[in-house]
Amino acid sequence: MLITAIAVIIVGPLVKLESPGPLFFSQKRVGKNGRIFKIYKIRSMYQDAEERKKELMAQNEMDGLMFKMKDDPRITKVGKFIRKTSIDELPQFWNVLKGDMSLIGPRPERPLFVEKFKEEIPRYMIKHQVKPGITGWAQVNGYRGDTSIRMRIDCDLYYIENWSLGLDFKILFSTIFKGFVNKNAY
């Protein structure tokens, strides 16, 4: 929590200077046993991002429900930096303290994606038998952001089926030593 507090003290004013509005962003996610909870992040987009998304749909680089574009104009300059370095994810330590999440586990998805993926990906719902995590086996293996959901699920299932304290330490140390830099973040 100390790291989160320091990051908020440093990054917070920069976020607010570039884009008025709340410092934090929350979104509904699906957790253990399908329970819905609010995940917290430092806001990386302009306040009107959802409205602007409608104008940009023709430039969507993803199929289906997901929306991604390389130089998304909805993301602030500070937002690009905090996404690349995963600083935007630090408020999720609050989710860990609340009991919604664990440090390590499969990343939680939004409810609309869960509905889609449970129909398309065999064994997808198994990931909801454990608490979601801030980092996980998929993330330390490079499957973050704009990577295949199927590859992330394969990693999540591997983690669940092979869980051990040793594997958790391996993931934790890999996260720390590889750094929090997300090459797949836009």
Where in this protein do the model-derived segments appear?
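A short, structured surface patch at a secondary-structure boundary
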Residues: 1, 9, 65-130, 171-175, ...
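A hydrophobic, helix-centered structural microdomain
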Residues: 1-50, 165, 170-186
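Gly/Ser/Thr-rich helix-start
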Residues: 13, 22, 32-35, 80, ...
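Residue-level recognition of specific faces of alpha-helices
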Residues: 13, 26, 74-77, 92, ...
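Short, glycine-rich, amphipathic interfacial segments at transmembrane boundaries or analogous
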Residues: 25-73, 135-154
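C-terminal terminal-structure detector
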Residues: 70, 112, 119-186
